[in-house]
């Protein structure tokens, strides 16, 4: 089931050392899913994956959370993907929690500037409370 869910069935007979970075990442996630634990700790599970596979993997993890009640704790540096799937975000800088809560409360212009030194707009493109971070172009004049 975990091989099917991560689309890695065709890789089952191959050595991990023969796999690309994205294939390897999906195999590691399949191995974690096969454990059927109540809690999954994932460190950058979307690393090496193209955008379509990132979304697919995070949708799978969200599905596991909804259907099995599996708690997911993961590190994600891709803010828009984190905002898309997380019920609760914790933003840290140098090991200290700077902000926590729902995506809209954490991903604000002041927080992005404080945490990442990033000048950005935070928009709700679907008018449903979801947020997307849009970085300002380098050297752009930034309205207050």
Predicted features by range, described:
Residues 40-44:
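Catalytic Walker B motif of ABC-type/P-loop ATPase nucleotide-binding domains
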Residues 36:
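Conserved catalytic motifs of ABC-family nucleotide-binding domains
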Residues 1-11:
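Conserved ABC ATPase "signature" region
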Residues 109, 115-144:
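ABC ATPase nucleotide-binding domains
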Residues 55-68:
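Helical segment within the ABC ATPase nucleotide-binding domain
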Residues 15-19:
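Conserved ABC ATPase signature
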């Amino acid at each position: 089931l975990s091989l099917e869910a991560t689309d890695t069935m065709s890789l089952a007979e191959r050595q991990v050392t023969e796999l690309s970075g994205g294939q390897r990442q999906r195999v590691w996630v399949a191995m974690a899913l096969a454990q059927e634990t109540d809690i999954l700790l994932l460190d950058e599970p979307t690393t090496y994956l193209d955008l379509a596979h990132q979304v697919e993997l995070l949708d799978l993890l969200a599905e596991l959370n909804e259907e099995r009640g599996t708690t997911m704790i993961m590190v994600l540096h891709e803010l828009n993907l984190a905002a898309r799937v997380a019920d609760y975000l914790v933003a840290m800088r140098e090991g200290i929690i700077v902000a926590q809560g729902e995506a809209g409360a954490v991903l604000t212009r002041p927080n992005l500037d404080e945490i990442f030194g990033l000048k950005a707009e935070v928009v709700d493109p679907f008018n449903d409370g979801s947020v997307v971070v849009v970085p300002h172009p380098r050297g752009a004049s930034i309205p207050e």
